């Protein structure tokens, strides 16, 4: 099971993702009433996830059963500008660019490690 514990900032949503003994950080869009492409996932709760290949993002985690949303993924990327409603993962949170919004680092390597920890299908708990 993936567990994501989030905290909300005006310009983004940050979190800590754990599965087994693996831990990383998450970056999402801010909370904007669950509006597609501009908001993080509105509802905390339980979801189903599975490993998936996305033509746009490569190997990802697909998050299913998200109310009023489709095609939600955990994928690689470092900056808030690379998100359209999905979740980015990284091994640390830093300010990498000049927009004064936190970023995540080493995202591709972090996603690869996460995918190795997961079975093909699993539960996701977001709080």
Locations of regions flagged by a protein language model:
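Cell wall/extracellular polymer interaction/catalysis modules
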Residues: 1-103, 108-122
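Low-complexity intrinsically disordered segments
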Residues: 123-127
């Amino acid at each position: 099971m993936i567990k994501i514990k989030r905290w909300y900032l005006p310009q983004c949503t940050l979190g800590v993702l754990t599965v087994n003994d693996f831990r990383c950080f998450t970056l999402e869009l801010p909370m904007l009433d669950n509006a597609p492409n501009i908001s993080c996932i509105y509802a905390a709760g339980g979801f189903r996830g599975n490993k998936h290949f996305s033509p746009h993002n490569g190997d990802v985690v697909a998050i299913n059963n998200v109310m009023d949303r489709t095609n939600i993924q955990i994928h690689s990327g470092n900056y808030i500008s690379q998100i359209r409603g999905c979740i980015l993962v990284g091994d640390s949170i830093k300010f990498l660019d000049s927009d004064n919004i936190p970023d995540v680092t080493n995202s591709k390597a972090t996603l690869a490690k996460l995918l190795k920890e997961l079975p093909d299908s699993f539960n996701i708990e977001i709080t």
